């Protein structure tokens, strides 16, 4: 039971780190990156579909993104979705592809994005701490039900604390890396 609770908690913490990594990847830096379009959604035959799933996205130059839809008829819808997104970019429609030049970030916008990155990191840490709390509650229940002794549960709690610290530090590293990437001119 204890191993199962610990394994479950670690799996959920790993998922929280993965989600944080994806969230931080969507924050636009001064460089072109196909991942920045992962959260841009287009209505594709009645169902919301991410641009990344309905087009080929390439980065021919450090500040240029080229989007070529798999279906030419969707070009206008993709262009509109990108214009309406919070990315702050302006696509140029060349008939069969979209060219997007990534503008240089202002110092103020960089600071804003760093705050946003820190906020996403904090959300991930809260998620990890919530997983820890639920696992601690589960360990307390296991001990109360007499399924494990006090010593075993104590060791498991220490193990859980180490695991929590490991994943929180991973989040800190991700945020620090993103911050450095954003502040790099």
Curated annotation (Swiss-Prot):
Annotated keywords: Cytoplasm, Protein biosynthesis
Pfam families, per database record: RRF
UniProt xrefs under HAMAP family: RRF
Matching PANTHER family: MITOCHONDRIAL RIBOSOME RECYCLING FACTOR PSEUDO 1, RIBOSOME RECYCLING FACTOR
Domain of life: Bacteria
Keyword set includes Protein biosynthesis: yes
Primary subcellular site in the record, as a coarse category: cytoplasm
InterPro entries tied to this protein: Ribosome_recyc_fac, Ribosome_recyc_fac_dom, RRF_sf
Compartment(s) where it occurs, according to its Swiss-Prot or TrEMBL record: Cytoplasm
Recorded family membership: Belongs to the RRF family.
Main function: Responsible for the release of ribosomes from messenger RNA at the termination of protein biosynthesis. May increase the efficiency of translation by recycling ribosomes from one round of translation to another.
Protein's name in the database: Ribosome-recycling factor
SUPFAM superfamilies: Ribosome recycling factor, RRF
Single GO cellular component term: cytoplasm
């Amino acid at each position: 039971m204890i191993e199962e609770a610990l394994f479950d908690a670690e799996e959920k913490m790993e998922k929280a780190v993965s989600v944080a990594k994806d969230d931080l990847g969507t924050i636009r830096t001064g460089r072109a990156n196909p991942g920045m379009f992962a959260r841009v959604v287009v209505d594709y035959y009645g169902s919301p579909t991410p641009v990344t799933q309905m087009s080929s996205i390439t980065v021919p130059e450090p500040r240029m993104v080229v989007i070529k839809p798999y279906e030419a008829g969707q070009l206008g819808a993709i262009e509109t979705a990108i214009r309406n997104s919070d990315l702050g970019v302006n696509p140029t429609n060349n008939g069969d592809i979209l060219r997007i030049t990534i503008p240089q970030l202002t110092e103020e916008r960089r600071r804003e994005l760093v705050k946003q990155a820190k906020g996403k990191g904090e959300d991930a840490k809260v998620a990890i701490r919530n997983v820890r709390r639920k696992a601690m509650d589960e360990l307390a229940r296991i001990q109360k039900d007499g399924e494990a002794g006090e010593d075993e549960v104590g060791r498991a709690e220490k193990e859980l604390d180490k695991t929590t610290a490991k994943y929180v530090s991973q989040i800190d590293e991700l945020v620090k890396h993103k911050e450095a990437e954003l502040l790099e001119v």
